[in-house]
Amino acid sequence: MATFSLTSTLPSSSPTTSLHSIPKPKLKPSTINFTHNLNPFNPNLKPSRHHYLSNYGPYVKAIALDFSGSFFEGGFGGLDEDPPSTPPAGLAVEEKPEPQCPPGLRQYETMAVLRPDMTEDERLTLTQKYEELLVAGGAMYVEVFNRGVIPLAYSIKRKNKAGETNNYLDGIYLLFTYFTKPESISPLEAALVTDDDVIRSSSFKIRKRKY
């Protein structure tokens, strides 16, 4: 029989049985293969000091640049060190003894407001001129403080010797402190009033408070 001989030549096991009988390879989870590529994690491991500085170095450096000129200038010496306790620039009070008033002299202050468009050389020349004028009048312990350009409380019109009128909204403030004779104030005020570089000036005597 043709049908009998054909079936006798086929394998004894059916196709379904042969597929199930093939052993399947045991695959490891992908997470296991991934963890093999990582370094073992140690929960007690702490970042080293070098690692901390490398991550935060640019941030600390930016603070030092932003606060250049203040008590942050130069940054901190180290992360374990406290920031310097020096007060901000402009607020530090230098402890020095106040000069005693010489006999026959009085303590005065003169505030002079200069043209805001003066150059630095012009300002220094004017400052030296009035310092010499004060010393020639018998003044002692002359000190000058440059307050910089400050807006005026109100605009000031001033005519110079050439007949030109200027309207000033701000000026360079100079403060003179000194000891001198009372009669030397009038020549100083006369020189300031006639100076084209001086917008406004005022001199007054310092009175000590009595407690």
Swiss-Prot record:
One of its GO terms (biological process) is translation. GO terms for cellular component: chloroplast; ribonucleoprotein complex; ribosome. Residues 1-65 form a transit peptide. Its main location: plastid. Residues 1-25, 80-100 are annotated as: Disordered. The keyword Lipid metabolism does not apply. This is Small ribosomal subunit protein bS6c alpha. GO terms for molecular function: small ribosomal subunit rRNA binding; structural constituent of ribosome. InterPro entries: Ribosomal_bS6, Ribosomal_bS6_sf, Ribosomal_S6_plastid/chlpt, Transl_elong_EF1B/ribsomal_bS6. Component of the chloroplast ribosome (chloro-ribosome), a dedicated translation machinery responsible for the synthesis of chloroplast genome-encoded proteins, including proteins of the transcription and translation machinery and components of the photosynthetic apparatus. Component of the chloroplast small ribosomal subunit (SSU). Mature 70S chloroplast ribosomes of higher plants consist of a small (30S) and a large (50S) subunit. The 30S small subunit contains 1 molecule of ribosomal RNA (16S rRNA) and 24 different proteins. The 50S large subunit contains 3 rRNA molecules (23S, 5S and 4.5S rRNA) and 33 different proteins. CDD domains: bS6_chloro_cyano (cd15487).
